[in-house]
A protein has these predicted regions:
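Active-site core of bacterial EAL-family cyclic-dinucleotide phosphodiesterase domains
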Residues: 8, 12, 157, 164-204
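Catalytic strand-loop-helix junctions within cyclic-nucleotide turnover domains
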Residues: 79-88, 106-109, 113-131, 155-161, ...
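Structural alpha-helical segments in enzyme catalytic/regulatory domains
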Residues: 15-18, 96, 102-103, 167-174
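Catalytic/regulatory signature loops of cyclic-dinucleotide turnover enzymes
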Residues: 131-155, 171-182
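Conserved long alpha-helical elements within nucleotide-processing catalytic cores of c-di-GMP signaling
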Residues: 1-26, 33-60, 69-73, 77-78, ...
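A short pre-motif secondary-structure segment
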Residues: 66-71, 110
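Short beta-strand edge/capping elements of PAS-family sensory modules
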Residues: 24, 149, 197-200
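Sensory input modules used in signal transduction
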Residues: 29, 116-118, 185, 203
Length: 204
């Protein structure tokens, strides 16, 4: 695609932050909602062409002092530099909307939608993977609530939800290691005969 691989992107971002600081930096995570539909409707060759075109569009943005890379097939991450999070959101949304409109006019059954999560990088942030986790969390929320291309900004609410999820997962691992889980079989009874016809397995 011409974009750097993720590891190279991380190296460049860490070097940039060390040299220039983190003020005005916003981490973005974008993917295409229901992209499998595009592949099924037009074929993988067209799908790959759309992703390649998006990568080229991102490369052009990279000339303005921002960084981007392709993480997986239709998942791209990068860093923007703007005065405020509102400006970063509005400019990036304008960019994705322009790309979507151009692509949808070319492939009229495409109905392309780009979901983006955005996280404002703070002075005490150094872990790029954590920045991406935060942007991903906002992106997932964007995909569940929006039917058009949109940019969801990571907030304190997302942080609390992410911490709660991590605590639950950590607690589940500890409970499994301590053999605290118990398996139960909940009977399924036929409404016609009143007899047990099966069971549902539950773990608590």
């Amino acid at each position: 695609t011409g974009l750097p691989i993720y590891n190279k992107f991380v190296d460049k971002l860490e070097a940039y932050m060390a040299a220039h600081g983190k003020s005005g930096l916003f981490f973005v995570s974008s993917d295409f909602s229901n992209f499998q539909y595009v592949n099924e409707m037009y074929g993988y060759e067209v799908g790959d062409r759309i992703l390649h075109d998006f990568a080229i569009a991102l490369q052009e943005k990279c000339q303005n002092g921002v960084l981007f890379c392709r993480v997986t097939s239709d998942h791209f991450v990068g860093v923007l530099k703007e005065d405020t999070v509102e400006k970063a959101r509005d400019k990036y949304l304008e960019f994705t909307n322009t790309f979507v409109q151009k692509t949808n006019s070319r492939y009229d059954q495409c109905n392309l939608v780009i979901a983006t999560g955005m996280y404002e990088i703070l002075e005490n942030d150094w872990s790029v993977s954590s920045m991406m986790d935060n942007a991903n969390e906002a992106r997932k929320q964007c995909k569940t609530q929006k039917v058009d291309s949109a940019v969801e900004i990571y907030t304190e609410k997302f942080r609390k939800n992410l911490e709660n999820t991590r605590e639950i997962v950590s607690g589940m691992v500890a409970a499994y290691n301590n053999k605290e889980f118990r398996a139960y079989l909940q009977p399924k009874v036929s409404l016609h005969t009143g007899k047990v016809v099966g069971a549902e397995a539950l773990v608590r």
